[in-house]
C-alpha cells in the first residue's frame, strides 16, 4: 500500500511528531476499578455498558514502541489504507478508532487509543491492537521492560495484559477486540489477549493482514 511506503515501512513509518502528555480518555472514570489480568489466549465478553468507548493504553520502559491498530474484515484483512491507524493517520471509520498522544506514566512511556465498537462499520469484524519496534535501529520486543496493555470500558470495567518480552519479534499483535456470535445468540463483542508477533516487524504484521508489500 502506498500509504505505508510513503512513511518508511521498514522502520517506524517516518519521523514521530512531537509528543504530548497523555490525557485521560473521555468517558473513563478518574478513579477506575481494579483491572482484571488476562493470560495469553484468554478472551472475555465485553459488557454492553462498556461498548460506547474502550480506552486502550500501552506502556513500557526500555526501547520505544509504537501503537498501531488495524480494522479487519471477516477474513482477517484490511479493506484498504483507511483501515490502518498509526501516528501519520490517527483516525479511521469516522472516529470509531482514534490513536491518541504519547506520554509518560509511572516511569513508563505510554501511548493511547480509543475504540468505539458500536460505531464500527458492519464490515469490520475485529480491531487488532499491535505494537511495532524500529527495525532500522535494530530494536525488538525483547528490549521492552514492564510492558503492559490496559483496556477499560466506558463504564469503568478494566482488563490488563502483560505481553511477552520476546527478542525474536519486532512487531506484536498484543490484543484484539472482535465481534462474536454463537448460534442464534445475539452478537457480542469480546477482547482477546494475544502476544504473538513477527520477526520482520511491521512488514510482517502488514502482510499477515492483507497489506501488499512490494
Question: Which role does the model predict for each range below?
Answer:
Residues 1-214:
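Intrinsic-disorder/low-complexity signal
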